[in-house]
Design a protein with these regions (language model features):
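An N-terminal assembly and electron-transfer interface module characteristic of large anaerobic redox
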Residues: 1-245
Length: 245
């Protein structure tokens, strides 16, 4: 799927931005496959434009974010002030998008004001709230998940994703676990699942799992066991092929 995205873009752009993600938060790691994406693409496809593969590693300090931004910016200009301004504008836009997500908006809602058609989202007068837990690239890529989110929304279901849950709540929930989760996604997924146990408005949970994903294999199992033992919330696991959809 990632190869497909690149093939679609390669003749339309001057650069491909494929950052080498190592860590996006202190003391945590991103899945190693993200660190290998630039090399995978560079050595498997021909005729590519220049690839910007700056490492993003915030494991020790968030200050490394500005270092990465400066490294990228110097490819285009020597104006340090201009790069810093662009970095601050990007941060502001990012924080605004995070706030929209926490208010229950989905990424597709950012680019359109068109209202979805109302569906039959009530059972005995109660609105259905369904939590969808999984990697964001699975949740928000309609090709991979076969338009799962659209199908839910078009039927009037209120969809709740990991991004809509406050980071402090996630950290509080995962702090109760016997061992710290050092994968960024694992912490968020598990914390979100545990948070659902406290909510009285959740009617069901869908765990969108990648076939062959090591993190998913144990986080999903832990979450499912916990929820089935301590609640009567319906829990379903949808396993998809992240390579082909």
């Amino acid at each position: 799927l990632f190869h497909g995205h690149v093939l679609n873009l390669k003749n339309k752009v001057d650069y491909l931005f494929i950052p080498r993600f190592t860590s996006i938060s202190k003391r945590e790691y991103v899945c190693p496959k993200f660190g290998g994406l630039p090399d995978m693409i560079r050595h498997s496809l021909n005729g590519l434009p220049d690839i910007i593969d700056t490492e993003i590693n915030l494991r020790k300090s968030n200050k490394n974010a500005i270092k990465a931004a400066m490294e990228i910016g110097y490819r285009f200009t020597g104006d340090t002030s201009a790069i810093k301004r662009a970095f601050n504008m990007a941060k502001e836009s990012y924080y605004k998008s995070r706030q929209l997500l926490k208010k229950g908006k989905l990424p597709d809602d950012f680019k359109t004001r068109e209202k979805r058609k109302p569906g039959n989202n009530e059972i005995d007068g109660k609105i259905l709230n369904i939590a969808v837990i999984g990697h964001v690239y699975n949740i928000y890529d309609s090709y991979i998940n076969m338009e799962l989110i659209d199908k839910l929304k078009n039927n009037g279901v209120n969809v709740i994703t990991v991004d809509m849950i406050d980071e402090d709540i996630i950290n509080e929930k995962t702090s109760m676990l016997p061992k710290r989760l050092f994968w960024n996604f694992g912490r968020k997924a598990m914390g979100s699942a545990l948070h659902m146990l406290d909510r009285k408005d959740i009617d069901g949970i869908i765990y969108l799992m990648s076939f062959g994903c090591g993190i998913d294999s144990f986080i999903c199992d832990l979450a499912e066991r916990k929820i089935r033992r301590e609640s009567d919330i319906p829990f379903i696991v949808l396993t998809i092929d992240e390579h082909s959809g």
